[in-house]
Structure formats: C-alpha cells, structure tokens
Amino acid sequence: MIVIFLGPPGAGKGTQGKKIAKKIDLPHIAIGDIFRTIIKTSTSEAELINNYVRQGELIPNEIVNQVIKNFLLSSEYKNGYILDGYPRNLEQAKFFESFIKEKIKIIYFDVSGELLIKRILGRYSCKNCGKIYNRYFLQPKTDNVCDVCGSSTFDYRKDDNEEVIKKRIEVYKTETYPLIDYYKNSGNFYIVNGSKNEQEIEIDIQKILKIN
C-alpha cells in the first residue's frame, strides 16, 4: 500500500502519518524531516537547501525529486509506505509516477489558514523521542516533561515565525492547488477535515484505508 498525505504546513500530516504507519506496519516518510536532516550536514547541498527553507520558499523540483527517488527505491520501502509532503506540484507528481507504478491513495488535509498559523507557531517536539506538542493545543501533562519518555529537552523549529509561515502557506497554495485538481480525477483522492482533533482525524483516515 502506498498512501500520500497532502496538505499545507501545519495540517497534521506528520502526526497522523506516524500514527497510521505504526497501525498498518509501514514506514512513514516525512519529506520535511529528510531535508532537515540534510541541512544539519556540512555540505554545499545543505547550505543551498537551508537558504530556501529560511526564506519560506519551496526547494526546487530537481533537488527534491532526486532525493526522494533515492529514498523510495531502497528495498526497505518495497512493501509500501506513507509519504508525507511529496509530491507538492504537478511536475513532482509526474516524476513520481514515472518510477512508481503501484496504485496509490491520496488523502488531502483541509485546514483554514488561521488555524494553520497557530498550529505551526505553537508546535515543538521532544528532542529525545520526537513526540510533537503545541503550546496552544497540546502541552505535556507535566510542565516541561515529555509524556512519552520523561525528557525535559525540547526542540523549537527556527524557521517557524509568522512571516515565514504565511509565505509558506501562500507558496503552498500556488504550487499545490493545481495538484489537488489533478488528483481529484484519479478515483483515489480523499479529503479529511484537518480542523478536527487528532483522534477524529485518525478515525476518518482509518475508514478511508479500511483499517481497524
């Protein structure tokens, strides 16, 4: 099974991707995480990618496509995966279809711009286990202590400020809305209301994928 999660930054793709992937025992491939890992390396490619991220711009298709192809053709993904954040435009979608022939399901997370900004500005994660929190909606049960692993060290993303977020959302709309129209005609396109809470969204996705 190959599942693509589409939606703007802050729509909840990462949170749901991890949950659903664990439930159906498939890898969750988060494109943003892949590129953030690359950025931490001391390479010219990392510096180039980081410049796009800091400015809230999308990384060029030729860079994204090659990185993703190298990942997806690995043997560990031969049985399927949940793909979070790719493709983002028609050119990427057609490139993806050129080397992936399996049937896919596309799930789009529909969320208002105002809620997206709050979700992104408020989010942070445990540095130890990666558990995601939000200062507006989902704080740890005990202040400054991770619910999962008990760590008190958290990571706040440096590219998450309101001006950059608004630009990322606008860039997303320009690049990705034509892709949504393209997939609507595929017969395997589904929309979930991303404004619901985590549990409700998870249930909706499980129904689409026909899992318990």
UniProtKB/Swiss-Prot annotation:
Sites where the protein binds ATP: G10, A11, G12, K13, G14, T15, R123, I132, Y133, K196
Protein's name in the database: Adenylate kinase
Described function: Catalyzes the reversible transfer of the terminal phosphate group between ATP and AMP. Plays an important role in cellular energy homeostasis and in adenine nucleotide metabolism.
Organism (species): Rickettsia peacockii (strain Rustic)
Locations listed in the record: Cytoplasm
Region (LID): 122-160
Record pathway: Purine metabolism; AMP biosynthesis via salvage pathway; AMP from ADP: step 1/1
SUPFAM superfamilies per UniProt: P-loop containing nucleoside triphosphate hydrolases
Gene Ontology CC entries for this record: cytoplasm
Catalyzed reactions: AMP + ATP = 2 ADP
Residues covered by region (NMP): 30-59
Biological classification of the source: Bacteria, Pseudomonadati, Pseudomonadota, Alphaproteobacteria, Rickettsiales
Keyword Zinc: yes
Entry-linked InterPro entries: Adenyl_kin_sub, Adenylat/UMP-CMP_kin, Adenylat_kinase_CS, Adenylate_kinase_lid-dom, P-loop_NTPase
Domain notes: Consists of three domains, a large central CORE domain and two small peripheral domains, NMPbind and LID, which undergo movements during catalysis. The LID domain closes over the site of phosphoryl transfer upon ATP binding. Assembling and dissambling the active center during each catalytic cycle provides an effective means to prevent ATP hydrolysis. Some bacteria have evolved a zinc-coordinating structure that stabilizes the LID domain.
Residues binding AMP: R36, E57, L58, I59, G85, Y86, P87, R88, Q92, R157, R168
Keywords for the protein's UniProt record, in alphabetical order: ATP-binding, Cytoplasm, Kinase, Metal-binding, Nucleotide biosynthesis, Nucleotide-binding, Transferase, Zinc
Family per similarity comment: Belongs to the adenylate kinase family.
Assembly and oligomerization: Monomer.
Binding positions (Zn(2+)): C126, C129, C146, C149
Location, primary (coarse class): cytoplasm
Entry's Gene Ontology molecular function annotations: adenylate kinase activity; ATP binding; zinc ion binding
Biological processes per GO annotation: AMP salvage
Signal peptide from the UniProt entry: none
Keyword Zinc: yes
